[in-house]
Amino acid sequence: MSVISMKNLLETGVHFGHQTRKWNPKMAPYVFTARNGIHIIDLQKTVQKAKEAYDALKKLTSEGKKVLFVGTKKQARGAIEREAIRSNMFFINNRWPGGLLTNWNTVKRSIARLKKLEGMEADNSFEKEVKTKKEVLTLRRELEKLRKTLGGIKDMATIPEIMFVIDPKKEEIAVKEARKLGLKIFAVVDTNCDPELIDYPIPGNDDAIRAISLFLETMSNAVIEGTGGVVEQPRFSEDLDSEALALEYQGEYDESGKFIMDEDPDSKKTKTAEEPSATIEPSTTTTVEVDQNE
């Protein structure tokens, strides 16, 4: 069961925003405070907005509307694909193809080409269609490129009515196309984002893997519930005093611009200022873990 409580959000690092110098002032209503050079997101607002988004997404999908999940940053790719497939919806988790929405007819031709090549691969007809090994290799490379870019939307017959985005600042082109065509946009918005571009903004860390996974799992459940599937009801709770949030923060920037996070009394890990994400591991003493593989 997805639990969107202040305690759970704290444990997954949702409250960590970006450096204060990188913030978008329009995020002010969702910022609790600033500590040691970074903004701390108000998790009471996160819980409230997550519930609003869940209810709206459930209602919209119950009306037959389709969802396109978008998240091309490394931290989001796996969860985007997993939760889109689980909810039987569509996804883009690598490069956003410019014009995917606004030039849909052209994209449909590329999807048709992808399906043709997949059919050739399935019945081993590459060698029958072309004469040389070089041509076969060229076709296989084309297939892999199309599959990587369009594989998550190859069964998308029409433009969807809803887009769910991880990091709308990074996915700026996708958001612009969606707004132009009137799609309902749901998004996790960090402190450097413009929430006014989003119909249903959810304030939170859009860099931490566990935070991203929590949001996507919850919203995927909303889609499943809306389309008649059976999922455990998520729990939305504001059961932790928000003033405790800033007190849990243990990090600071050193003189070289490195972000220092206490992992234990005997060791420290640093993270460059250009990589703002961090996750918190629950323990008696707050511990912050950096995703070293990302």
Curated annotation (Swiss-Prot):
This is Small ribosomal subunit protein uS2. Disulfide bonds: none annotated. Belongs to the universal ribosomal protein uS2 family. Residues 256-294 are annotated as: Disordered. The gene is rpsB. Residues 280-294 have a biased composition (Polar residues). One of its GO terms (molecular function) is structural constituent of ribosome. One of its GO terms (biological process) is translation. InterPro entries: Ribosomal_uS2 (IPR001865), Ribosomal_uS2_bac/mit/plastid (IPR005706), Ribosomal_uS2_CS (IPR018130), Ribosomal_uS2_flav_dom_sf (IPR023591). Residues 256-274 have a biased composition (Basic and acidic residues). GO terms for cellular component: cytosolic small ribosomal subunit. Keywords: Ribonucleoprotein, Ribosomal protein. PANTHER family: 30S RIBOSOMAL PROTEIN S2 PROKARYOTIC AND ORGANELLAR, SMALL RIBOSOMAL SUBUNIT PROTEIN US2M. Signal peptide: none annotated. NCBIfam families: rpsB_bact (TIGR01011).
